[in-house]
Amino acid sequence: DTDRSRGLGDVYKRQECNTAYGGKRSRTEDHLETAKDHGFSDIARVDIMDAEGEFTIPVRDRKHLEYDIVGDHLKNYDFMVNLAHFKGHAMGGFGGVIKNQSIGVASASGKAYIHSAGKTRDVSSVWNNLASQDDFLESMAASAQAVADYFGDRILYINVMNNLSIDCDCDSHPHAPEMKDIGILASLDPVALDQACLDLVYAVRPSEGNDNRPLVERIESRHGRHTVEYAEKIGLGSRKYELKELKPQQAV
């Protein structure tokens, strides 16, 4: 609720970094204006974390990346609430908390570094140096793990499963959702959380007004489940989980 969010405005900020592609979110001033236009500035202070630079943090899995490049303002925080909109994605197949912690926390050049699986950090040349699909997905998992290692156990993960389009919010003309909203899931394990959301999508029985087939096809065509499989393999978390449902009257 917006009023409750406003009340938290002094204790939390909405953070992300500039994009590695064109548009209003690639430049800090325009990015802040876009956040204001969409109402984010009304509920929290907005921090573009790479507005004043970037720094590198170590990665455990060095198959593709030597380090992770994140916004300099990450140093200002000692915990993180990773709040993601779970949906499809043109490149990753789907986007959840792992992608949010990887691409979302990376600076613009860090995004280029992940998308190219370590080939370049040059934003102007990344689209000519895109990695193979699995290498890209594995790089996302590795960089998400780097951020998890940076914060330790001080991260809460939340996926909001509404407006379940096959396309990401970064798409200027996303496809209209063909599925009904599912709910909000939270965990201290990002791998378990994304896996649970995937399972809920796959479990839908297609019916009029609630067709999961386009989203499943998007995930399958991009080999999207490899992200959680590889994330588990490198030790970011576990795909095993227990789903506990909270009814509205139980919510605090």
Place the predicted regions along the sequence by residue:
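Extended, low-polarity segments enriched in aliphatic/aromatic residues
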Residues: 10-252
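Single conserved hydrophobic/aromatic residue that forms the stacking wall/gate
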Residues: 1-12
